[in-house]
A protein has these predicted regions:
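Ankyrin repeat domain, specifically the short helix-to-loop turn at the C-terminus of the second helix
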Residues: 35-42, 68-76, 102-110, 136-144, ...
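Ankyrin-repeat boundary/"N-cap" motif
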Residues: 15-21, 46-54, 80-87, 114-121, ...
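Alpha-helical adaptor scaffolds
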Residues: 80-108, 112-117
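Conserved ankyrin/ankyrin-like repeat signature
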Residues: 32, 65-66, 99-100, 133-134, ...
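Ankyrin-repeat-protein effector appendages
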Residues: 2-23, 107, 141, 150-153, ...
Length: 175
């Protein structure tokens, strides 16, 4: 019984620390993130409350400095958002975070990974949301424009169906 109580207490401490990291990422609190990393906290554990990953939240919310800290601490770039099963690059693309997209690409994230629900790549996400700078960053990173989503659409098809002429121009120029 004593062992069980000791183990339960340790689990509570771990959950509390993990929630602190996610709170610090969400609040863009660089000092707290740095301290948690110095204390040996792993960036590669999902938050127990939200089930999400610090690297995905930092990418989605545009926490550039925090994202750099996480990437330098070897954040796992294969982790997926618990809802859409999307990568950190998908999150950055959907939110229009071009700088974060560039950082993730530079650190070797899989650029053309498809989401399981709609088959979107990060390029599809950026284009569908009208984020031209993010789409440009993903294209410069080497994204394959010929990939089709589950509806059979390329990123160019989506731009055309959205009547987004600036995006169409970018995609045809970058072919």
């Amino acid at each position: 019984m004593r062992f069980f109580k000791k183990k339960l207490g340790l689990i509570r401490i771990i959950v509390k620390i993990m929630s602190k990291l996610m709170s610090a990422v969400d609040a863009n609190d660089k000092a707290t993130v740095e301290q948690l990393l110095r204390d040996g906290y792993s960036v590669n554990e999902a938050d127990q409350k939200s089930k999400n990953w610090p690297v995905i939240i930092a990418a989605f919310k545009g926490r550039t400095t925090i994202l750099e800290l996480l990437l330098n601490a070897n954040a796992d770039l294969t982790v997926l958002d618990p809802g859409m099963q999307a990568t950190a690059l998908h999150a950055a693309a959907y939110a229009g975070r071009s700088k974060e997209a560039e950082m993730l690409i530079k650190h070797g994230i899989s650029i053309d990974q498809k989401g399981p629900f709609n088959g979107y790549t990060a390029l599809h996400d950026a284009v569908s949301q009208g984020h031209i700078d993010t789409a440009r960053a993903i294209l410069k990173g080497g994204s394959d424009q010929t990939i089709k989503n589950k509806s059979g659409q390329t990123a160019l098809d989506i731009a055309e169906s959205n009547n987004d002429q600036m995006m169409v121009n970018l995609l045809t120029k970058m072919e």
